[in-house]
Amino acid sequence: MRVHVADHPLITHKLTALRDRTTPSPVFRSLADELVTLLAYEATRDVRVETITVQTPVAPAEGLTLSDPKPLVVPILRAGLGMLDGLMRLMPSAEVGFLGMVRNEETLQPDIYAERLPTDLSNRQCFVVDPMLATGGSLIAAIEYLFDRGAVDVTCICLIAAPEGLKAVEEATAGREVTIVLGALDERLDEVGYIIPGLGDAGDRLYGTAAH
């Protein structure tokens, strides 16, 4: 498994505002959208392309286009939905699938409540977006689900992560083509599985359903 932790002042600046408990939901959504676009540059470094020739107003020019089958972007609902537009802005021709998961607060394990994905993902590159990698349960389940359907490699974009969750994903995906791109790697998980210092509940803060 490959891990890339962003090292850029603009990303740190936006993450700082995202963490601030006084940041209102509309601003939080805007920051999450901007952050995933910045992180997507690294996440798409190995996106599959093929050479084409186009005609400029002056002469032919050789360039690149995304290969078929097009990449599949998979937000983990509900919080991952807030990151979808930021990635699709860079890859508008990508397809989108949805995976609905909720963390069981007693077991800290994910429960799948919705799925809308192509049945056959053979030869597909998949990009999973989820704001937080905490225990790793949801991400592990999503990655396994995609590989079971034939995906060839999976790249996950998360705004923040805990070391415990990152280690769990690495152990669970050993031997798989998995890349994790992070805005920041935080200190630890607390006793109930929240990232410290973290940013609270990303879904609640994105959609204004609670204050943390």
UniProtKB/Swiss-Prot annotation:
Record carries keyword Cytoplasm? no
Gene3D superfamilies tied to this protein: 3.40.50.2020
- Please give the biological process terms from Gene Ontology that the record holds: UMP salvage; uracil salvage
The protein's name in its UniProt record:
Uracil phosphoribosyltransferase
The record's section on Pfam families has: UPRTase (PF14681)
Matching InterPro entries: PRibTrfase_dom (IPR000836), PRTase-like (IPR029057), Upp_B (IPR034332), UPRTase/APRTase (IPR050054), Ura_phspho_trans (IPR005765)
Reactions listed under catalytic activity: UMP + diphosphate = 5-phospho-alpha-D-ribose 1-diphosphate + uracil
Q: Which UniProt keywords apply?
A: Allosteric enzyme, Glycosyltransferase, GTP-binding, Magnesium, Nucleotide-binding, Transferase
Q: What is its EC number?
A: 2.4.2.9
Q: Which HAMAP family match?
A: Upp_B (MF_01218_B)
Cofactor(s) named in the record? Mg(2+)
Tell me which residues bind uracil: 195, 200-202
Q: What class of enzyme is it?
A: transferase
Entry-linked SUPFAM superfamilies: PRTase-like
Q: Which molecular function term from Gene Ontology is one that the record holds?
A: GTP binding
Give the family this protein belongs to, as stated in its UniProt record.
Answer: Belongs to the UPRTase family.
Binding, 5-phospho-alpha-D-ribose 1-diphosphate: 78, 103, 130-138, 201
Activity control mechanisms: Allosterically activated by GTP.
Q: In which pathway does it act?
A: Pyrimidine metabolism; UMP biosynthesis via salvage pathway; UMP from uracil: step 1/1
Its biological purpose: Catalyzes the conversion of uracil and 5-phospho-alpha-D-ribose 1-diphosphate (PRPP) to UMP and diphosphate.
Give me the comment on cofactor binding: Binds 1 Mg(2+) ion per subunit. The magnesium is bound as Mg-PRPP.
